[in-house]
């Protein structure tokens, strides 16, 4: 840019910054500044440049106002309805971006944004000024061919435009194929994004293509490189006497694993005895680091994956199966190397002593949650007879589990007990049933024992002042909690914020206790959860708000979570006397990156798992067009009523399908009221609905309310 242009920019910007400046259009500016006709184009160029820099902003009426010049950098998240948000690290609230202010940004891009509006008590609005880095190179979608070209409709609705594909770059794809398209142009200068087909996944109706599309869409690694597989085969050798040297031998201890029936990667085993009024609990975790050496091909691949991903019809493991289901899995009757946390716990649930040690274990029985539930809750004769010798230990487990749970409750730990779904598939991968996940005495035993082991290990290493990886859950943002408190007042609930600013876990726990069994329980629980921050990994011990503890880590699942594998490595270096200054410096250097990377990979896995679950629920419900169901109103918005069925499927009764009256949304009381007949729909209300539509692409289900016979008689 020449010197004159920059000078003009400076003069005009100073003019707009003047306190007496009144927002005006380009024509008005031109007249006021007495710009000659032949230079109006230059004025427009100056204003465009200032706008691009974020120094000025154009209102919806076309008037120029001063913009906030501070550039913020963050991640752009698009919304299927055409707008988006920028999430800035360290900022408590996202920035709203209108369709006109996206500046060509796409889902997942790293962008620079300036604040254009920050109204009191409302969400900030901004304008994207620069795309720092594109977040997506490849997109999965449905291919549609035309005469001389084709286009891909993205599966992910957050990608707001179809991708144009020239015929010569279609790789022979035909209409109906699910494909992976690589972007060659991001749609600059008002053009559509353009790409080339790099992989055809199969026809949309082919078995397994639906989930394969999700796998590819989230860029989940599937096949292991040959080098990694070869290394896994080499290290997966049976445990020898030499391997056991220097380890605590606990093979004679009565030991069990308790997992789901279909679990194959068994990374935790339990031992439990009682001496006087004290419990001796052993949580024995597979010693994966014995087989996965730091910076080996196996280790690099595990870090790249971050976690195993559990989808409806498949598991994408973090480690090759020869390790995850073989030598690292604590299979019954096999000698296995472990890292154990052996705790002495008093009658109040306090850990009064503990030992973290390298051990050798040999599991007596591979138990399932169902079997243990049958023994402890159902007193099933057949199961009790089969596992007669283990029953005293199971009874002790139930006893200690209750003590530990009560202790957590006393200190204020929060337990969001949302119903989870298990999808039952046939051989073709089609859903044939949906069952609510059974959270029973057996699942609670394992949950409680893993939690206490994780806390114990975290506290031990915090006080040793050794570089470590913690699982942190920070205190919720003050503004979000204030909004939640205001919302709760509509239902007659209160939550005390200390000093009017900080919330304590105990207050959230009290709220959940109060709403238990009420019509509004589901909605308030969800809103409370959304008001929380996401748990993440960190080298700093910032505490865990949800568990109401200062010390927490992930120690118990090194087969399927990289952070657990990472801290096992640190623990073993320490136990073996290798934690010298060089090692400390090494861990201090790598842990921030490991924490950030694994937190991100965990979120990716969670999203893929959620999408798969939503997809399979829609596929299941398409078999029930026109059928009626009993459900409960789980949410109410201005566009309709959300109804949840007993099997956890949720669908929307859109307000346009509520045809017996004109319904208005009462935002203050979260209800729908008919303007003529005054019929009211409230949270938690039982309703009967008919399934009228479902869409696999948007993963949505539509219901229509069914009149009860009594209502029909009254109408007649």
Enumerate the language-model features and the residues they cover:
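Charge-lined substrate channels and their catalytic hotspots, especially those that engage the 3′ end
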Residues: 1-282, 289-335, 373-374, 619, ...
């Amino acid at each position: 840019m020449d010197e004159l242009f920059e000078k003009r920019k400076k003069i005009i910007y100073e003019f707009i910054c003047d306190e007496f400046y009144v927002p005006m259009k380009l024509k008005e500016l031109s007249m006021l500044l007495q710009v000659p006709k032949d230079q109006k184009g230059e004025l427009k160029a100056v204003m465009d440049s200032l706008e691009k820099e974020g120094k000025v902003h154009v209102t919806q009426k076309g008037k120029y106002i001063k913009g906030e010049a501070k550039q913020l950098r963050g991640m752009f998240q698009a919304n299927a309805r055409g707008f988006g948000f920028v999430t800035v690290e360290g900022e408590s609230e996202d920035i709203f971006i209108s369709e006109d202010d996206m500046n060509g940004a796409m889902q997942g891009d790293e962008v620079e944004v300036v604040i254009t509006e920050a109204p009191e008590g409302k969400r900030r609005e901004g304008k994207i000024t620069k795309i720092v880095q594109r977040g997506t190179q490849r997109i999965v979608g449905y291919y549609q061919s035309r005469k001389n070209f084709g286009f891909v409709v993205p599966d992910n609705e957050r990608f707001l435009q179809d991708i144009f594909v020239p015929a010569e770059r279609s790789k022979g794809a035909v209409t109906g194929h699910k494909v992976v398209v690589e972007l060659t142009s991001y749609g600059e200068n008002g053009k559509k994004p353009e790409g080339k087909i790099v992989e055809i996944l199969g026809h949309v109706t082919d078995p397994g293509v639906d989930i394969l599309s999700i796998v590819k869409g989230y860029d989940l690694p599937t096949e292991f490189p040959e080098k990694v597989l070869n290394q896994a085969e080499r290290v997966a050798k049976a445990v020898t006497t030499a391997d056991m040297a220097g380890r605590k031998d606990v093979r004679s201890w009565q030991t069990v694993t308790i997992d789901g029936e279909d679990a194959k990667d068994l990374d935790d085993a339990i031992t439990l005895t009682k001496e006087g009024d004290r419990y001796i609990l052993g949580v024995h975790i597979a010693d994966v680091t014995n087989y996965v050496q730091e910076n080996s091909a196996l280790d690099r691949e595990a870090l790249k994956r971050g976690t195993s991903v559990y989808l409806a019809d498949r598991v994408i493991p973090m480690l090759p199966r020869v390790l995850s289901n073989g030598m690292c899995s604590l299979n019954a009757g096999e000698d296995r190397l472990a890292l154990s946390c052996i705790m002495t716990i008093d009658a109040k649930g306090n850990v009064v002593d503990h030992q973290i040690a390298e051990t050798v274990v040999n599991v007596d029985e591979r138990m399932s949650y169902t079997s243990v539930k049958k023994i402890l809750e159902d007193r099933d004769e057949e199961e009790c007879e089969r596992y007669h010798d283990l029953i005293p230990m199971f009874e002790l487990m139930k006893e200690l589990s209750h003590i530990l749970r009560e202790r957590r409750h006393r200190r204020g730990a929060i337990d969001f007990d949302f119903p989870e779904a298990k999808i039952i598939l046939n051989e073709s991968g089609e859903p044939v049933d949906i069952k609510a996940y059974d959270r029973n005495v057996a699942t609670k035993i394992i949950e409680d024992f893993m939690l206490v082991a994780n806390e114990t290990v975290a506290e031990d290493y915090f006080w040793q002042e050794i570089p470590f990886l913690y699982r942190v859950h920070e205190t919720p943002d003050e503004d979000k909690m204030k909004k939640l408190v205001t919302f709760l007042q509509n239902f007659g609930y209160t939550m005390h914020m200390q000093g009017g600013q900080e919330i304590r876990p105990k207050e959230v726990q009290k709220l959940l206790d109060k709403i238990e069994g009420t019509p509004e329980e589901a909605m308030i629980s969800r809103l409370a959860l959304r008001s929380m921050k996401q748990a993440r990994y960190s080298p700093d011990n910032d505490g865990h708000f949800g568990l109401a503890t200062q010390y927490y880590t992930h120690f118990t699942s090194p087969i399927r979570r990289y952070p657990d594998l990472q801290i096992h490595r640190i623990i073993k270096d320490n136990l073996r006397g290798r934690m010298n200054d060089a090692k400390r410096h090494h861990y201090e250097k790598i842990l921030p990156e490991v924490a950030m990377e694994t937190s991100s990979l965990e979120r990716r896995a969670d999203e893929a798992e959620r999408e798969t679950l939503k997809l399979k629920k829609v596929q299941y419900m398409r078999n029930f067009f026109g059928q009626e169901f009993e459900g409960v109103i789980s949410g109410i918005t201005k566009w309709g009523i959300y109804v949840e069925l007993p099997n956890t499927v949720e669908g929307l009764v859109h307000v346009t399908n509520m045809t017996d009256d004109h319904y208005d949304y009462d935002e203050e009381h979260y209800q729908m009221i008919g303007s003529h007949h005054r019929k009211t729909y409230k949270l938690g209300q039982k309703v009967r609905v008919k399934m009228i539509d479902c869409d696999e692409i948007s993963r949505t289900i539509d219901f229509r309310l069914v009149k009860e016979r009594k209502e029909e008689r009254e109408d007649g």
